[in-house]
Regions:
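Non-catalytic structural scaffold of enzyme domains
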Residues: 1-161
Length: 161
């Protein structure tokens, strides 16, 4: 049985991701590491901090220690920390927005990045640029923040968000 360890920065998507993994890979064992201080810290600072990187490295090392076959990083805001942490383990790491960035780069040169969390804008734009560079493509990345959407998500839930 394959084991997937999901590293979360909030409880918001925990149930939905667990359900999706169970539907897509029913034979997989899903384990979760949840640290809601990560999103709060990156939001307060506007970028990842050395403390975030340190904790992400420890979480990835813990995931590897419990036998993960895949580590899934649930949050775009800490995606750059996940990329650093991925270099500390031998387990494959998948970022939640990685496939989206690759697909966007394959589809066009002007790419809009719509984010509902302010701390996600820069890392998501950087990921798209990185994927474009790897693919040998020139792209223009246009960021857009839906201001207040995170507050709606936390107060009113996913449907309203």
């Amino acid at each position: 049985m394959k084991k997937i360890v999901v590293v979360h920065t909030s409880l918001v998507s925990h149930e939905e991701l667990t359900r999706l993994f169970s539907e897509i890979i029913p034979e997989a064992e899903i384990r979760n590491i949840i640290d809601d201080s990560l999103l709060a810290e990156v939001s307060a600072n506007g970028h990842i901090t050395p403390g975030i990187v340190s904790r992400m490295c420890k979480y990835f090392e813990n995931a590897q220690a419990i036998g993960a076959d895949l580590i899934f990083n649930q949050c775009s805001s800490v995606g750059e920390a996940a990329a650093i942490a991925a270099r500390t383990v031998s387990v494959p790491v998948l970022r939640i927005d990685e496939a989206m960035a690759e697909e966007a780069v394959s589809l066009g040169q002007r790419i809009g990045v719509v984010a509902t969390v302010g701390s996600t804008v820069e890392p998501s734009c950087n990921l798209v640029r990185s994927k474009a560079l790897s693919a040998g493509r020139n792209v223009e990345v246009i960021p857009y923040l839906v201001d207040g959407a995170l507050d709606v998500l936390m107060r009113e839930g996913r449907e309203r968000h």
